[in-house]
Curated annotation (Swiss-Prot), chain A:
Subunit note: Forms a heterodimer with the catalytic subunit TRM8.
Protein's UniProt keywords contain Protein biosynthesis: no
GO BP: tRNA (guanine-N7)-methylation
Localisation: Nucleus
Known pathway: tRNA modification; N(7)-methylguanine-tRNA biosynthesis
Any one of the GO CC terms: nucleus
Protein family according to the UniProt entry: Belongs to the WD repeat TRM82 family.
HAMAP family: TRM82
Protein name stated in the entry: tRNA (guanine-N(7)-)-methyltransferase non-catalytic subunit TRM82
WD repeats: 103-143, 244-286
Keyword Nucleus assigned: yes
InterPro entries tied to this protein: Trm82, WD40/YVTN_repeat-like_dom_sf, WD40_repeat_dom_sf, WD40_rpt
UniProtKB/Swiss-Prot annotation, chain B:
Lineage: Eukaryota, Fungi, Dikarya, Ascomycota, Saccharomycotina
Enzyme Commission no: 2.1.1.33
Main function: Catalyzes the formation of N(7)-methylguanine at position 46 (m7G46) in tRNA.
Binding residues for S-adenosyl-L-methionine: G103, E126, I127, N161, A162, C181, T259, E260, E261
Gene source species: Vanderwaltozyma polyspora (strain ATCC 22028 / DSM 70294 / BCRC 21397 / CBS 2163 / NBRC 10782 / NRRL Y-8283 / UCD 57-17)
Localisation: Nucleus
Descriptive protein name: tRNA (guanine-N(7)-)-methyltransferase
Catalytic residue list: D184
């Protein structure tokens, strides 16, 4: 029996009225209609870029390079028995994956909305590109208009946008950070024409940009426990590192209610709160005991790192978000059902548990909404066992009781809309159970010191 | 016997030699070597033999190696590397490391810099395990054999990946000199990011160097020399020293003649390309 692919990412504008979700290689947009409480489909975009084409281009390019190199070195062309030279020319062949080759997933990552809420940004794995969409709220056919698709040499792993919404900063899997003006034309030969503005010798996991005291900064986090703060646009001047993590960093955020604070999490079993201006760690919140009851067989370490008892479990924070106007953070550990909400004391900067919320399935993503009327979290779930229910849960703050709770009715309405959008059997996001994209890959960033010499 | 892995034969001379040296290292690596140690030992230590420390010439700087590095520069225990400069009454070091030799190889430069800069602590960083062991054994032997006048107390080596973890060891503006001697050329285009001088890494080197600190580079590969010069000249925080400065600088002389690679190039009558750069002060922040 086929199912609608679980949602990998969900974001909304500040009011929570416009919602964008990623299913497989599709982005879909909905608008919440206040009058009838329903979600209307506003637009859809599918990544149809074929990786085969890219491989073919790469193969042709490599062949041309080898031919040129042979020419230069004066290597003789092969000869037939009669002594005639023959020009060997092959069509570029697209390599066909052999049996047991890992499947290719055209993931869409790093979904985010610009500060002025007129653009949606994302990254496509297929051609390692950054996608910029204009959100045309008045276009009833499709509100998502792709205005830029810029491929990068290595896969973008995290992106952010500057406060003026003019520049996207891209951190890639190879450790390089690029800055791209949205309005500039697409660069074809990105390898030759684009220089990174800064870099780590490590996979990058997060990037932020912020302004403090009239100075602009870029923060980057990596697999080697580092959080680096550089000036911007003078990104060649490193301001400082924030040292303290002992495992990889997977998620960093700066709350808008206090831009001197940076919060980070990852493979360590604690949430770190920093005064990044001073470069000091102010607090660490250990979540081990909270999370342990929710750790399951998905967290067993890979065989080659497993202990003799076969019970070594490894887990890490997948994502950490902060509410823009209130001193609350929320995070979840990968492959758990538990959402943890923390409150920060704004005078002592100590974190304490505000609330735990158990979701019906494992959480795959979290984002926030917040305006003067409402605030809370958009949560997507690994609902593959649910029979096409519970794709998303909206969690909102009840200001009278100061507690967060799941908005069941609204969440159900959204789920109905998803089913309506994708219920047809031939829908691109209909998959078999074993075709679901990998949803849990943060823990694979954990280092085990595999290489000795 | 598997020739690529001589450790499989537990009685090979190399394994016996390495085991013996490892025990020696364990005992002496972090010990304050002075006349009393010498009296106990009563004999001179032989310098290590390079042929027992062979290993692959390259190491992938992107790999997940088993490395020891401090969480931050504040956590670094320098007393273990430079016990002679540790004041046990205050619990503090009397000096900080100010010179770093990145990719120090077999340690030739360290050993020649030691007497030339007696007031500085000099650290070599090397990513290859056996090569690091060799340098450690060499320093242990030299310290022991010169215990009377406390020579070679100001140099040491750590096994590490400077491309990833340099800022874990050094504070901002801690270093006055950094050496990059005969680095791995990484000829292939797609491996250029693995080179030790890239525009992104230079920003990190600039962070640990103080104003007017010097980056020294030397290589026998002209392409790599041009690459390093290009990137250093393009970087806003570095400015090249002229030929006259190079000719009058004692480090350039030592670097040209001291390193094992330098000697090898000398024997083969190859070229040596030198370039030195001054760390400029940060410009005004815009």
């Amino acid at each position: 029996m086929s199912l609608i692919h679980p949602i990998q990412a969900v974001v909304s504008n500040r009011s929570g009225e416009l919602i964008f979700a990623v299913l497989k290689n599709v982005i879909i947009a909905y608008r919440y209609d206040q009058t009838n409480g329903k979600y209307l489909e506003m637009g859809k975009w599918e990544d149809q870029f074929s990786r085969d084409e890219m491989i073919k281009i790469a193969v042709v390019k490599e062949q041309a390079r080898q031919l040129a190199e042979n020419e230069e070195k004066g290597i003789k062309k092969s000869k037939t028995n009669e002594g005639n030279t023959i020009e060997k020319k092959h069509d570029a062949k697209i390599p066909v994956p052999g049996p047991g080759a890992p499947p290719i997933y055209s993931q869409i990552r790093n979904l985010m909305i610009s500060n002025d809420e007129t653009m949606l940004l994302a990254c496509a794995d297929s051609d390692k590109s950054v996608l910029v969409f204009k959100i045309e709220t008045l276009n009833n056919d499709n509100c998502l208009k792709l205005i830029k698709r810029q491929p990068f040499p290595k896969r973008p792993n995290a992106i952010t946008i500057t406060e003026d919404d003019k520049t996207v900063i891209i951190a890639d899997k190879f450790g390089d950070v690029y800055s791209m003006l949205i309005e500039s034309p697409v660069i074809e030969n990105i390898d030759e024409e684009f220089e990174p503005i800064l870099g780590h010798v490590s996979m990058l996991t997060g990037v932020l940009s912020t302004t403090n005291n009239g100075m602009k900064f870029v923060m980057t986090s990596d697999r080697d426990e580092h959080i680096k703060i550089s000036h911007f646009p003078q990104s060649y001047i490193v301001d400082k590192w924030l040292f303290g993590h002992k495992e990889f960093v997977s998620s960093i955020c700066i709350p808008s209610w206090n831009s001197n604070i940076l919060v980070s999490a990852g493979g360590d079993h604690g949430i770190f709160l920093w005064d990044w201006i001073k470069g000091e760690k102010l607090d660490e919140f250990d979540f081990t005991d909270l999370v342990l009851p929710y750790i399951n067989e998905n967290h067993l370490a890979p065989d080659r790192f497993q202990n003799e008892e076969n019970d070594l479990k490894e887990f890490a924070v997948s994502k950490l978000v902060s509410l823009p106007n209130n001193p609350y953070f929320a995070f979840f550990v990968e492959a758990t059902k538990l959402l943890i909400i923390l409150e920060v004391d704004q005078s002592t900067y100590k974190m304490k548990l505000l609330q735990k919320i158990v979701l019906p399935y494992y959480i795959t993503f979290i984002s926030t909404f917040s305006d003067d009327k409402t605030m809370g979290f958009n949560i997507s779930l690994d609902n593959r066992e649910s029979g096409d229910k519970d794709f998303v849960k909206f969690i909102a703050l009840d200001t009278t009781s100061n507690t967060f709770s799941i908005k069941e009715e609204q969440s159900d309405e959204f789920n109905t809309s998803i089913v309506n959008s994708f219920s047809k059997e031939d829908s691109i996001v209909k998959v078999e159970l074993d075709e679901v994209y990998p949803l849990y890959n943060i823990i694979s960033l954990k280092k085990h010191g595999e290489h000795y010499s | 016997m598997d020739l690529r892995n001589p450790n499989r034969d537990p009685n090979s001379r190399r394994v016996l030699y390495r085991t013996n040296k490892e025990e020696n290292r364990k005992e002496l690596k972090h010990v304050k070597i002075d006349e009393s140690t010498l009296a106990q030992e009563g004999k001179k230590l032989d310098l290590p033999k390079k042929r027992f420390y062979r290993q692959r010439a390259h190491s992938n700087p992107f790999s997940d190696h088993q490395l020891d590095y401090p969480t931050s520069p504040d956590d670094m225990n320098w007393s273990k590397l430079f016990p002679h400069y540790y004041d046990s009454t205050t619990g503090k070091m009397t000096k900080d490391v100010t010179i770093a030799d990145i990719g120090c190889g077999f340690g030739g430069l360290l050993i020649d810099l030691s007497p030339a800069f007696p007031e500085d602590l000099i650290l070599g960083m090397e990513i290859r395990v056996q090569v690091t062991n060799y340098v450690e054994d060499r320093i242990i032997a030299l310290r022991t054999n010169h215990a009377k006048d406390y020579q070679y107390q100001n140099i040491n080596v750590i096994r590490g990946n400077a491309m990833k973890f340099l800022p874990n060891f050094f504070q901002r503006a801690q270093l006055s000199k950094m050496f990059f001697c005969f680095p791995d050329p990484h000829f292939k285009q797609r491996k250029h990011k693995a080179r030790i001088i890239t525009n992104t890494l230079l920003s990190e080197y600039a962070y640990v160097l103080k104003d007017n600190g010097v980056i020294y580079t030397i290589t026998d590969v002209e392409d790599l020399h041009n690459w390093m010069v290009k990137h250093l000249e393009e970087h806003p925080l570095f400015e090249r020293y002229d030929k006259e400065w190079e000719d009058n600088d004692k480090c350039v002389q030592i670097m040209r003649n001291a390193t094992e690679e330098g000697k090898k190039v000398e024997r083969k009558k190859g070229d040596k390309f030198v370039a030195c750069f001054r760390r400029l002060p940060n410009p005004a922040i815009v």
